[in-house]
Regions:
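C-terminal subdomain of alpha/beta-hydrolase-fold enzymes, centered on the catalytic histidine
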Residues: 153-223
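Alpha/beta-hydrolase fold nucleophile elbow
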Residues: 49-62
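Glycine-rich nucleophile elbow surrounding the catalytic serine of serine-hydrolase chemistry
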Residues: 59-69, 187
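Loop/turn elements at helix/coil->beta-strand transitions in domains of secreted/extracellular proteins
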Residues: 9-12, 51-54, 76-80, 174-176, ...
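Accessory cap/linker subdomain of secreted extracellular hydrolases
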Residues: 1-3, 8, 71-172
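Cap/lid segment of the alpha/beta-hydrolase catalytic domain
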Residues: 1-47, 94-95, 223
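Short beta-strand immediately N-terminal to the catalytic nucleophile in serine-hydrolase-like folds
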Residues: 57-59, 84, 180
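Active-site loop signature of alpha/beta-hydrolase-fold enzymes
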Residues: 21, 89, 220
């Protein structure tokens, strides 16, 4: 559906899957391999006979994160980004105010555990959050989920989060970006911060062409 949407508008549409999900090989670990895999995809595109030197990226949530991961590579043809309900700091989203965001983190872990999305039953969530320790909430809900454990346990581990969020991506951004946020979305505070950082710290051409749209929506319903 997404591919046809862009193709009807004259674009060559390429849909990149996530490592270890659906038909993609490898091990699934959210957010960790997106830069490596994104760069490899851009390098592949450059070698195609139909490539005209221009790449535009679009995606929401973790697929918005995938764009930020390669936002410093205009040398690979990247010209612009459209990031919806995602920011440069999953660390801040998961640990906003110093407490782990159990609703967001556990819901996503249950839904994405394995090679395909699964239904999240509220009874599973209710059962999981009624007891301690927090790091075992995944076990109570569905079974051991290593990346969820890492999110909980590594709140103060800068090296861990740098592998996911990078370092100052709003400063190293090299192409204009359209940010779309929701008033009821957990990424809203960090998306607003991203926008302010870009317009004050990115180069002039990028800063003047970057925009932020905020609308009356949440997260999952928009993804």
């Amino acid at each position: 559906v997404i591919g046809r949407y862009w193709a009807r508008r004259g674009y060559t549409a390429i849909i990149q899957g996530t490592r270890g999900r659906y038909g993609s090989g490898g091990k699934f670990y959210p957010l960790l391999y997106e830069r490596q895999d994104g760069i490899e995809t851009l390098e592949w595109i450059r070698k195609q006979p139909w490539f005209d030197g221009n790449v535009f990226m679009w995606g929401a949530s973790s697929f918005g994160h995938s764009q930020w991961c390669v936002s410093d590579r205009p040398d690979l043809g990247l010209k612009a980004l459209f990031v919806q309900i995602a920011s440069t700091s999953f660390r801040r989203m998961f640990h906003d105010g110093g407490a782990f965001s159990l609703e967001s983190g556990l819901f996503w872990a249950i839904r994405s555990r394995g090679s395909q999305d699964r239904e999240v039953k509220m009874t599973n969530l209710d059962q999981a959050v009624q007891d301690f320790p927090l790091v075992e909430a995944d076990d109570r809900a569905i079974g051991d989920t290593p990346f969820f454990n890492d999110w909980v346990l590594n709140q103060n581990d800068n090296k861990y989060w740098q592998k996911i969020d990078g370092v100052n991506r709003t400063h190293t951004l090299q192409v204009p970006i359209l940010l779309m946020a929701g008033w009821f979305d957990p990424f809203l505070p960090t998306q607003i911060e991203d926008f302010n950082q870009v317009i004050h710290n990115a180069n002039d051409n990028v800063a003047t062409e970057t925009r932020l749209i905020i609308g009356p929506w949440g997260h999952a319903n928009e993804v």
